[in-house]
Amino acid sequence: MRVDFLKILFALTLTIAGIAPAMAEEPGVHRFATYNIRYVNANNGDTGDKLWANRRTAVTNIVKDYDFDIVGFQEVTGNNKDSQTGKSQLQDLIDMLPAYDNYAVEREGKNYSYNAIFYKKSKYTVVDKGMWYINEHPSTPGLSWKYFGDANTIARTLEWILFRDNASQTEFYFACTHMNYSLASSGVYGAELNARMLRELVGETPVVLVGDFNMHRSHEDTYRNYMSQFYDAALHTTTTCNPKGNITHTGSNWYPATNANCSGSEFDYQFYDNIVPLSREIITEDYNRAIAPSDHFPVLVRYKFQDTPSPTSYQVTNTDELLVAVAKATMNDTIYLAQGEYELDATIQPTVSLTFVGGYDKQFSDVVGVSKLRQKEAKQVFNIPQYYSLTLYNLHLENGSSTSALGGGLLAINGSKLNLYNCRFSNSQSTTNAGALYANTHDTYIENCVFDNDTAKTSGGAIYAETMESLTIIDSKFHHNGCTTGAALYVNGGRVLNIQCNGFYDNISNKQGALTIVADQYSAAAHLVNNSFLNNQLIAKKGLATATKDFGGAGLYAKMNNDTQLFNIAHCSFIGNHTVFAGTKANFGGGALRIAQGKSCMMNNLLLANAEKASDTEYEYVDYTIANAETLWRNTENLLSSSESIADWENDLVNTIAGLWNGKVFTADVRENGTYVLKSKMLNGFNLCYLTTNHRLCESAFGFDIDGDGNKSNYLKYDQIHNTRAIKACVGALEYKEGATSITEVQPQDGIQQVDEHQYILTGAPNVTVYNLAGQCVLSSNNETIDLSPLPSGLYIVNQHKIIR
């Protein structure tokens, strides 16, 4: 056998020098790295061994010695040539890494600073490539959200390549970015843009995103954007230092990893999806130079293209089995719970993303009800760390409590995504925020849930939602909750708020509505469709009213970030909400709703018998206080109270409306209070008939851009209980379903009349005609009187009438 002594001698030489020669990698493994190599900066203190001329060999040797298949470089200078070599960093990398080809994009069009992807040209074929700028207009060079005052004057980009692995023919994406170091605004918005656009680009194709992200994992809003779409390799592999040191940060501060002065942040990440990470290494090689080759260490992750492990499922019938399943569960597993009650004396704290599905029969063959998770102690039921997601189906969480600064009496999540379906959160409390649910997530989705009898001290009697991207709440009920601000729901932030087909009733706040929305994002938009706000109260505490003018809106209070942000309200009912304030009346506004700031548009809403009063005065009609009212009400169709509809005392405000509709106009769950006295009142008949006959309540003219893609869609086809609306729809959250098609004879002066079990006689001019609210003629007479008692209880349009008993 022939022995190659030169190769042995070379390997021994490397070992003696402290350099580990690259070992042959197993087949099918791909070695991907990220490396910020520090730009040429001789004018600002980079001298001696920090000069690029004195470290370029170490930088490129790391790439070769540690056998990087693909590496994403950051801070690669193009036109700023080293004074000793006469070359730019980019040219040196090209010359010194001949086995690699590259895709390098300059960030500002000035040949100054690049993100550069270098890849082994023998191992991969480029199928496609591209880039975008990290700003409000990704196809155009420019600074990222600079008008937010970021201390940053460098444009940021993301570069991507669609590769084909020559051995397996597998296609995958590799992307590289260098994020803004100002996290106050553009870091957050840039992260959202990168994560969203990269997901749209790659779909379900394997992808690895590397770079210097200038963030810690504790920077929740920024980090959560990436975690909402991808996985962090550091959390799903074991990290080692190669060849020396015991550090977790990736910044070096120029010191070797074994030096006590070696310090820095973990700014360098690899995010991935649909590919399996095998190991992660912080490459601490310095070639015995007593100085690191850059102020960042490169990070290497070994990947393999293989099927990701299938999630495991668990079936539990009691509390002990539930806790064991949570302890055993791995990423994206599902735990199925049999119907029944599970008493807890500790908080469930998963360290992975999980789904819980309750309500199964004993054979786990079908969902037959719900599973109740009840706290015996004054603790939360769930607490989810910032990295993970949670999905709940068919659960009733009850009797929780929180004293933490964030709150969340039953559930607190600082994670990526929260999804709730057919769940109930009840009888919980918090000494701070969020009596039931604290949701600090990238996305939150709530459907067909109930939040009742939950209280908090500060904000969000039931929910405090602090979403980065989207908050969607559909078909849910909020009742008998209480808090200073946002008696039922307090929303802080969110790019898209979509609140449809919900009921907010009998909630009590002390400052701002049952629903309070404070949207602090630059591009936020809020859409409220088919919601009912009934009998909510704002009872101000003494002393509060003189401190600020941000009071009012017992049903809804909203304040967008600026006057250009959209706030759309359509087919909503605001009825019987009222405000009692102490102190200066000018500090309050709106018995039903107050929109303090935003570009508002309202269409086809019902605002009736809402009022406000000082503690020592009578109620007076105030349905709303809205900024920019002239623009708001132009060419819209909303039915407001008239002076005749104002009750003389508090109970009449609610009793009148509750009696009129007897629950039918809202939701089946809104129960009539036994103390209500059914009354008959004429409610602004001129407006109602005028709208019905002339404006036709055209839903087609009012669309929403729910997902923020710039395309408006019509979300008014269905009413609050998902019945298809007639072409000539009724105002408010629910449409009457008497089956008629048109109104042809009703005149603008006609009124709306309640008929109940009492016998009412109408008298007036001859030819009295009675219509239901869908426009069908149900009674007519050539006489001056007509007996309404044969009609079912309900609302009717009657022309030329007076009322007698």
Name each region found by the language model.
Residues 23-95, 107, 112, 265, ...:
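N-terminal, active-site-proximal structural segment of metallo-dependent hydrolase catalytic domains
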Residues 76-171, 283:
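Structured beta-strand-rich core segments of catalytic domains in phosphoester-bond hydrolases
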Residues 185, 189, 199-208, 215-309:
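Metal-dependent phosphoester-hydrolase catalytic domains
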Residues 319-323, 332-355, 359-362:
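N-terminal extracellular ligand-recognition/capping segment immediately after the signal peptide
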Residues 351, 419, 446, 455, ...:
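Predominantly extracellular beta-rich ligand-binding scaffolds that present long acidic/polar faces
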Residues 744-805:
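C-terminal outer-membrane/trafficking sorting elements
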